[in-house]
Amino acid sequence: MVAHQKADFKSKWAMVVTVNNLNDKKRADLREFSEWFIETLRLEGAFIGHYFNYEAAPVTIVETLPGNFDSCTNAYQKIHKEHPQVVLVVHILPQSQSNEYEWMKVLASRYGFVRQGLLYDNCANRFQNVETDQNSVFRNMCQWIYRSGTAIVRNEGNACGILHGKDPKPTFDKVLFNSEDIKDSVFKVLHAEEEPRGADQENMLKISGYPGMLNTFGIAQLLTPYRVNGITITGAQSAVVALENKFQVYQAVQDFNGKKLDRNHKLQVSSLVVSSPAVPLEWPSLKKSKKLVEQVGKPIRLSKVSS
């Protein structure tokens, strides 16, 4: 039997680099900057009550050609396709008021990413030349990232992307879900209206207590390595999750209920189906038992039946 290693919860993020005259020295410095940036973001976020738990390094770094929209689009498509678990994309921009800034906003919205643009010059000097102090800069970014993550989770127009074909520019379709669709799903799962029966309910669990900015991908990561078949967000920090079978639900509850993500977030995980307590058996009293024994010991009288 192979035991799966259950990694602690870490949100994944990616970096897009659009820099003029990019060379190996700049690449090495940006890799070092990425770790410094995410750690500083975590510390400053905790100071104002926003607790980020991103991995220390980006899961991928994608380079694009300056001033090339197709190159920029391909970078976001690549992240979306190859790393669907990515929540945050940090885009290193070549200069202020660049086209890449506008493209970043459009593409991040299209593929459902939280975005944060940074000027390369500020990255190179670690924000030493900005007008405001470094703490304020990072706390403003923390607030933006938190609000953006919450907006993605609650946005009525949040879409699933479907790519058709193998061409360089496949067709991209959006499937929109409005609040009524979500509300119907919640009622079907949690209430008596068309409630799932038997095996369907046994495959579901309730999870709460995680950071409110998480979207469905982030919630699924919490339950690694179990296979998540569906997620319905029921509140700012609660959701109903469908797993593969009832055995995975049982094991996931054992593994994750009460798990601390950080000092302010503790998971609460339970099965959607609450087992009914066994009906207690009513044993006869000693006096009644003796009476029953006496009755059993008496001879049986048969009445004569006339034919």
Swiss-Prot record:
UniProt keyword Cell division, yes or no: yes
Location(s), subcellular: Cytoplasm; Cytoplasm, Perinuclear region; Nucleus
Single GO biological process annotation from the record: chromosome segregation
Keywords in alphabetical order: Cell cycle, Cell division, Chromosome partition, Cytoplasm, Nucleus, RNA-mediated gene silencing
Tissue spec: Expressed in the germline (at protein level).
Main localization (coarse): cytoplasm
One annotated Gene Ontology cellular component of this protein: perinuclear region of cytoplasm
Domain of life where this protein originates: Eukaryota
Subunit structure, as described in the record: Component of the pid-1 variant of the PETISCO complex (also called the pid-3, erh-2, tofu-6, and ife-3 small RNA complex) containing at least pid-1, tofu-6, ife-3, pid-3, and erh-2, which is required for the biogenesis of a class of 21 nucleotide PIWI-interacting RNAs (piRNAs) that possess a uracil residue at the 5'-end (also called 21U-RNAs). Within the complex interacts with pid-1; the interaction is direct.
Protein function: Component of the pid-1 and tost-1 variants of the PETISCO complexes, which have roles in the biogenesis of a class of 21 nucleotide PIWI-interacting RNAs (piRNAs) that possess a uracil residue at the 5'-end (also called 21U-RNAs) and embryogenesis, respectively. Within the pid-1 variant of the PETISCO complex may stabilize 21U-RNA precursor molecules. Promotes the biogenesis of 21U-RNAs. Required for chromosome segregation and cell division in early embryos.
Protein name (database record): Protein pid-3
Organism the protein comes from: Caenorhabditis elegans
